[in-house]
Design a protein with these regions (language model features):
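Conserved NTP-binding/hydrolysis module of P-loop NTPases
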Residues: 2-10, 62-63, 73-91, 179-182
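C-terminal alpha-helical "lid" subdomain
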Residues: 3-7, 12, 18, 38, ...
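N-terminal pre-P-loop "Q-motif" helix
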Residues: 14-26
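Walker A/P-loop nucleotide-binding motif
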Residues: 32-51
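Conserved catalytic segments around the Walker B and adjacent sensor/switch elements
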Residues: 36-37, 59-71
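Sensor-1/coupling segment of RecA-like P-loop NTPase cores
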Residues: 40-41, 119, 123, 130-156
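Conserved P-loop NTPase "ATPase switch" module shared by AAA+ and STAND
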Residues: 100-123, 127
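Helix-loop-helix "sensor" segment of P-loop NTPases
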Residues: 148-200, 218, 222-227
Length: 257
């Protein structure tokens, strides 16, 4: 099931209560802690979704800087992006010195690095140290659990960070998510198709991971046996045709009589 931009944004707005608490924790730590933050969890759990939800949180004291991790990324490029934001603010307030610009305005730059698993371990360590020495900078890495374990094994950086792990959906939340998808996307799954048996089947197959649930709906869309609405519609059409033929036949019999 391919999702368009609007559908992706709609899915990004599905934030269950336990994930709302993670978002609140994220906001609290950005405000009150200098520690680097790591959003972690398995592929498809919704790490980038939480990052999107954070960016939807408007705070006049924050400037977001989103960087997508890739193998070409280096410290100079990140520092250049950081300085670009400072000079953008400087152009709006030329009376302030560059060195004290964000301190005087009480602004923080929140550096968001999605897909940080592509970064070299030494680069992650360097970014953490850079953030510690820059009081206006907060940094958030997005990593899978495996990437956290692998990179921590090589550079031991986890003790310098605060981990925020995204939980899997519970079975009731899986049901809510399916209902949400049926209303917000172009999936053939209708709200009325969702029942206990379907929820149980999808939950067991996906482990409550939203990305896997979305992928599972592609099977649903491509397999008519799952689509009770389509079957009901076909049966209804066949029934109407049969009724019309019977009525026509009875009329012909009566006419000949």
């Amino acid at each position: 099931m391919l999702l368009n931009y609007q559908e992706n944004r709609a899915i990004s707005s599905f934030i269950p209560q336990d994930r709302t608490r993670k978002l609140e924790l994220l906001i609290h730590l950005i405000t009150h802690s200098k520690q680097a933050l790591i959003i972690c969890g398995p592929d498809g759990i919704g790490k980038s979704t939480l990052l999107n939800a954070l960016q939807d949180y408007k705070n006049d004291s924050w400037q977001y800087c989103l960087i997508l991790g890739n193998s070409e990324l280096n410290f100079d490029l990140i520092q250049k992006q950081f300085n670009h934001l400072i000079y953008q603010t400087k152009s709006k307030r030329p009376e302030l010195s560059t060195s004290s610009l964000h301190t005087d305005l009480q602004k923080k730059i929140v550096l968001l690095i999605d897909d940080a698993g592509y970064l070299e371990s030494d680069l992650i360590k360097k970014i953490i140290e850079y953030a510690i020495n820059n009081p206006i900078l907060r940094v958030i890495f997005v990593l899978t659990n495996e990437e956290v374990e692998s990179k921590n094994h090589s550079i031991g950086f986890v003790d310098d960070c605060h981990l925020i792990e995204i939980p899997v959906l519970s079975k009731p939340q899986c049901c809510e998510f399916l209902q949400y998808l049926s209303l917000k996307t172009q999936s053939k799954l209708s709200f009325n198709d969702i029942n206990k048996a379907l929820v149980k089947e999808i939950y067991l197959e996906t482990g409550g991971i939203p990305g896997r649930i979305i992928a599972r709906l592609a099977d649903y869309d491509n397999n008519p046996k799952y689509n009770s609405s389509q079957l009901t519609l076909v049966a209804a059409v066949i029934g109407l045709i049969a009724l019309a033929l019977i009525t026509q036949w009875l009329s012909a019999v009566q006419f000949r009589a």
